[in-house]
From Swiss-Prot:
Name of the protein in question: Staphylococcal secretory antigen ssaA2
Signal peptide residue numbers: 1-27
InterPro entries: CHAP_dom (IPR007921), Papain-like_cys_pep_sf (IPR038765)
Keyword Nucleotide-binding: no
Stated role: Not known; immunogenic protein.
Length: 269
């Protein structure tokens, strides 16, 4: 499978990404040297953010997202352009999570989700709340060590109430997960690294047991990371969907995590 290494600066004015090919099964390493003209799969880009929060990219190299080649199935690469608009191209590549649509200024608060068609009806364009992490590892190769937050009972995602507007930074993992659970969690839990503790304090159950509909959380990286648990397989592996995991802000992807790896994550129920 392709091995993807990224080096990003999520909050600054530029970022460099390098793509390297390989068949190793271990986690990919970060390429600190950026674009290599001798590598046909290497590229880099810079971006600027204008006053309206729109991203403007300048590419260098021979590689382009349209060349992305995973192992099988169907994959949609979503290119995030600003905080309110998504443009996307579909590729016959690795995932069945194939349609992400976000409708702004929608007057109804009803939300509808399923694995093949994620629709978020949201009225806000706020850029407050927590960030997520941008990762440089390939799909199934993340080794995580986390400290379990104290377990609490009283509230749950499945029976909770909508807390209101999504105040997390648009395009980040926290923003996606808040919408994915229908807003039935706190909107001011901060960075993803803080979510397990914030959830426990708010009365949600937090443990190391995955369950469909739960939130997977880790403190790994500068800001931590959260993802939505789509399903738990018979062998204990966990299928999650997530935003900003290796492909930049606004990009929704999915992956399967082994049972042994899943045991190192926190799960908010």
């Amino acid at each position: 499978m392709k091995k993807i290494a990224t080096a990003t600066i999520a909050t600054a004015g530029f970022a460099t990404i390098a793509i390297a090919s390989g068949n190793q099964a271990h986690a990919s390493e970060q390429d600190n040297y950026g674009y290599n003209p001798n590598d046909p799969t290497s590229y880099s880009y810079t971006y600027t953010i204008d006053a309206q929060g729109n991203y403007h990219y300048t590419w260098k190299g021979n590689w382009h997202p349209s060349q992305l080649n995973q192992d099988n199935g169907y994959y949609s690469y979503y290119y995030y352009n600003g905080y309110n608009n998504y443009s996307y191209n579909n590729y016959n590549n690795g995932y069945s999570y194939n349609n992400y649509s976000r409708y702004n200024n929608y007057s109804n608060n009803n939300q509808s989700y399923n694995y093949n068609n994620y629709n978020s009806y949201n009225t806000n364009s706020y850029r407050t709340g927590g960030l997520g992490a941008s990762y440089s590892t390939s799909s199934n190769n993340v080794q995580v060590t986390t400290t379990m937050a104290p377990s609490s009972n009283g509230r749950s995602i499945s029976s909770g109430y909508t807390s209101g507007r999504n105040l997390y930074t648009s395009g980040q993992c926290t923003y996606y997960v808040f919408d994915r659970v229908g807003g039935k969690i706190g909107s001011t839990w901060g960075n993803a690294s803080n979510w397990a503790n914030a959830a426990a304090r708010a009365g949600y159950t937090v443990n190391n047991t995955p369950k469909a509909g739960a939130i997977m959380q880790t403190t790994q990286g500068a800001y931590g990371h959260v993802a939505y648990v789509e399903s738990v397989n018979n062998n204990g592996s966990v299928r999650v969907s997530e935003m900003n995991y290796g492909y930049g802000p606004g990009v929704v992807t999915s992956r399967t995590i082994s049972a042994s790896q899943a045991a190192g994550y926190n799960f908010i129920h």
